[in-house]
Design a protein with these regions (language model features):
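RNA-recognition motif
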Residues: 77-79
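Short, small/polar residue-rich loop motifs at catalytic or cofactor-binding pockets
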Residues: 81-83
């Protein structure tokens, strides 16, 4: 089962602006849609998409566009053990990670996205892994604290909620709706309340 796109929910008066942000600042019109939220939400929503570029220069350029469009820095971009990256809060309140595996440029920046990963913060990685395998997903990487599935253009990954919040640099507390719907080949709700749909009415980021 492949993920076709993710749908982020926001207040009805911010749908068009949020769609423009993902389209113009991040270039994600194909894989991110936006719709009006129907349930309240506060604090950390439990998930964090991760946008991975090939070159660190693309990380800098994307962050610059995001901040100019109203995003707020959570972690400034910097070199780390894993590469080069940081995190920011989108205008709709979604926490994003942005990174490159390359700490220094190996070629000129081109804007090439290597992959988009949807990181879900879960209560039990083991239980959630089993649940998603029962839905037909295949684990491509599997560790006690992290699992990544082969799910098409948008990769699905599982991480403990508190660990994900720490990695992003945000307070783990939060309540209410996740304000997220995953559009794929099945309709279900996972053990942590993340909704999956086969089709829906959305306003696309494109």
């Amino acid at each position: 089962m492949n993920i076709q796109r993710i749908t982020i929910e926001t207040s009805s008066d911010a749908v068009q602006a949020a769609g423009a942000f993902y389209r113009d600042a991040l270039g994600l019109a194909e894989h991110v849609a936006v719709r009006a939220a129907s349930e309240p939400s506060s604090g950390f929503r439990g998930f964090a998409p991760s946008l991975i570029f090939v070159q660190p220069g693309d990380v800098d350029a994307a962050v610059e566009r995001a901040l100019a469009a109203g995003a707020k820095v959570i972690k400034p971009v910097a070199k780390s053990l894993w590469g080069y990256g940081g995190s920011f809060l989108a205008p709709d309140g979604t926490a994003w990670q942005i990174a490159s595996a390359n700490k220094t440029a190996t070629a000129p920046a081109t804007g090439e996205v290597e992959r988009l990963v949807l990181l879900l913060g879960v209560d039990s990685v083991k239980a959630s892994k089993r649940f998603y395998q029962e839905q037909g997903l295949t684990a491509a990487k599997s560790f006690p604290s992290y699992v990544e599935f082969d799910s098409g253009d948008v990769k699905l990954a599982l991480y403990k909620r508190a660990s994900l919040a720490k990695q992003v640099g945000i307070d783990p507390s939060g309540s209410g709706s996740h304000r997220l719907a995953v559009v794929a080949g099945g309709t279900f709700t996972d053990p942590d309340g993340y909704a999956w749909l086969t089709a829906e009415s959305t306003v696309h980021a494109g």
